[in-house]
C-alpha cells in the first residue's frame, strides 16, 4: 500500500486506495470522495431488561453518522473558507515553501504549471472547502474539496508535487 504524505507537514493526506486523475499538467490530482455511514453499532451485552423489571432498554444512544471517507480516514481538519486575498497570500507562501523542497524536473514542471493550477482553484474559490492534515501545521498543504454539478459526493484536489509517496 502507498500512502501520500504532505512534504511540508508530514501528515498523511491520501493513499493509493483512492485513485486519482491528473489535472493542470499533473500539478493537481483530483480524487473522488464518498459519504459513508459510521456508527450505530448494535452491541448485545447479554442483559435482559425485561427480567430485571426494566421496560425500556436504557442503552447508549448510538447514532449513525455520515462522514466523507477521505476526511475520516486521514483525519483531515476543515478550515474556514479563504477569501480571494487570503487564498492568494496562502498560495504565494505555499509555492515558496514547496519550491524549496523540490528539485530538477519536479521543480521545473511545478513552476511552469502552478500558476494555471492556482487560477483553476481561484475559479472555484466560492465552492471550495479547505482541509489540512491532522497536525494542522500552518505551512502544510491544503486539500481542497468541492461538489461537481449534480454530484452528491465531494471531489478533492491535491497539489501532486506537495505529496511524498511512502510504502507501508
UniProtKB/Swiss-Prot annotation:
Functional description taken from the UniProt entry: Involved in calcium binding and microtubule stabilization.
Pfam families for the chain: TCTP
Species this protein is from: Triticum aestivum (Wheat)
Gene that encodes it: TCTP
Subcellular location: Cytoplasm
Keyword Calcium in annotation: yes
GO cellular component: cytoplasm
Keywords, in A-Z order: Calcium, Cytoplasm
Main localization (coarse): cytoplasm
Residue intervals of the TCTP domain: 1-168
UniProt GO molecular function: calcium ion binding
Gene3D superfamilies: Metal Binding Protein, Guanine Nucleotide Exchange Factor, Chain A
Name of the featured protein: Translationally-controlled tumor protein homolog
Superkingdom of source: Eukaryota
Family: Belongs to the TCTP family.
